[in-house]
Amino acid sequence: MSAIVCLRASLAFALLFTSGYTAAQQRTLPPMKIEQLTPHVYRYGGLTNGAFVVGRDGIAVIDGQICGSNGTQWLKDELKKRFPGVPGKYTGRSHDHEMHICGLEVFSDTARAISHVNAKGHIIREKRRTVVPEITFDERMTIDLGGIEVVLFYLGPTHTDNLIQVHIPSEKVLIAVDFVREGKSLAMPELRDLNLDNSIRALGYLGRMEDVDIVVPGHGGITTQQSFIYVRDFLVALKERVLEQMVAGKGIEDILKTVTMDDFSDYGWFHQWIRANVITMWELMYHYREPTLDPGCYECDFPIGFPVGEVDKFNGP
């Protein structure tokens, strides 16, 4: 397969991944459930994880559910039954991706909507099916629920330019959506929207944070901080190996054969996602590096944007 075909294939994969969740709405979804993690923090959800924090003065709901699931309305009804007289005070969005924030408008009668400042523009432009946030922040924000503080913070562009982390220090819980999965696992199906180097730094920071015993990912079971280190180690190794092959003049077809990452094959989702991770890492590195033109021209051998079979080598300036 040529480089340009691989690029198109990876973009098609991204569309397939996104549309797959639309199709998921038409099949039987996992049942909604609530799990108490600490005295004040709960995980809820079905296909995706949300969370909520209960204080004396109100409840903060972090993330919605997949569109069409009616999951947030289900949660609102459950909260009324379990915590009568305690209003929803805030709704937080981990990032702008719709499958994690659908339905939060059901809390708009009492709750104020929060997101990172960068998320608001995406939500408006893409017409996300959620309430547009009225409160935005840049680096850090603390909300008080009455005896319980919830800290929302931004580590820079990582998975999207607006992904935030949510920390409840007194409960030693960190909500880290779409940045890790349970145990030792790949975190993402592919890396197309990843800011790679800052993600590596952020993963290291999250792996060392104090006052964290429980990590709530965006999908699957709860985990620990070690999962951040697993993901960081994989990304560091994948970047180094793909770059090494590119510097040696290898195209994506050869890289897919040589960069097998077999030493990470015990990671969850490895066999399903490794090919797309390699392809999208190559895409990131293609734009990251500036090849030395002499004795060859990597971009001449592996151009982007030209029809397959009609590319002539040239000696650029």
For the regions a language model picked out, list residue spans one by one.
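C-terminal regulatory/interaction regions
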Residues: 252-317
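Conserved beta-strand hairpin/beta-sheet module of binuclear metal-dependent hydrolase folds
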Residues: 33-77, 165-177
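Divalent metal-coordination and catalytic microenvironments
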Residues: 40, 53, 63, 79, ...
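Metallo-beta-lactamase
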Residues: 36, 59-60, 66-67, 118-162, 169-170, 200-203, ...
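Active-site HxH/HxHxD metal-binding segment of metal-dependent hydrolases
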Residues: 77-144
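Boundary at the C-terminal end of the N-terminal hydrophobic targeting segment
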Residues: 22-26
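Bacterial N-terminal signal peptides
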Residues: 8-19
